[in-house]
Amino acid sequence: LYYKGEPVVEPSALGILMEEADLSNGFRILDATNSTFDETWMPVWGEYEKVRNHYNELTVTLSQPAKYDRTMIVRFRLFDDGLGFRYELPEQKNMNYLTVKDELTEFNLTGNHTLYCIPGDYDTNEFAYTTAAISEVREAMERNLRKKGYEAKATSFTVQTPLMIKTTEGLYINIHEAALVDYSAMLLNVDDKEFNFSAHLTPDKLGKKGYLQLPLHTPWRTIMVSDDARSILASQLILNLNEPCKLEDTSWIKPQKFIGVWWEMFTGGGGTWAYSDYYKAKPGITDYSKLTPNGHHPANTEHVKEYIDFAAENGIDAVLVAVSYTHLRAHET
């Protein structure tokens, strides 16, 4: 991938390993078709009233000949601000049900760029961001990491997507995915020696990374590129690659602003998760009616009323109280 004549991503591996089939090598090209698409559409809500969806597409049909007789399509869509690509498996006699073992997609960068990243995790994205060169990010991330107690750390050294990158020449690169439906979410393995990233799919408890049935397509892998970081934020590339809205009636969808009690327990506002200072409490065992409240749990009627009053006075549409009340005493709720 090039931007203004300069390389952004160097030649990189593609392919998927299924338990039933190796779809990473032994292919020959059956066909390659170019096309152009240009439309303007109106989202239900968003930053723009109208969105232009304009790209050049390359559809490459691949075949594993001889005894396998398998067909796979790799579809590329090139926009003014980046690239999206995905794998497609049409219906065919030699494949039906598949279990994903691994995805081999790589993103080979051109140097020791700066990353703006958080650790790859199977459960949460709630980490402080680290800014460091690829060669230094492992150590820098460990220094920056604050353990929360509910992490599910990836089994290899990974970072979360979307991943923001800045090159030494001042170019901004963003790696992410679009149209994530019936497939595992993607983290990125980090090779801090070769400055390489590769797909790391989130597994289930058995280590499986997807259960698929043909015909199918994977999510889009996306690479956005700009010499202005603001253009990455303003890009509609991922939105254009996502599936269209399937709802026939969208009249009830209205954008609104809201404030919430939940965030107070994360941002140091004084609220805590603990109803009581009794640290040995166990759900289903502890009788919370006999505990003395510490006064720091923000999800109580008096405090929520304060949020409601603040919202009303400041033109905020709603208050979100996203926390369980089941363990609070009656007079607290």
Could you tell me what each predicted segment is?
Residues 216-231, 236-302, 314:
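An acidic-aromatic substrate-binding cleft motif
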Residues 1-248:
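N-terminal accessory beta-strand-rich subdomains and adjacent acidic, glycine-rich linkers
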Residues 303-322:
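Catalytic domains of carbohydrate-active enzymes, especially glycoside hydrolases
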Residues 326-333:
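Conserved small/polar residues in nucleotide/adenosyl-binding loops
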Residues 262, 321-324:
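Active-site-proximal beta-strand/loop segments in catalytic clefts of secreted hydrolases
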Residues 119, 271-272, 323:
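Short, solvent-exposed loop/turn and secondary-structure capping segments
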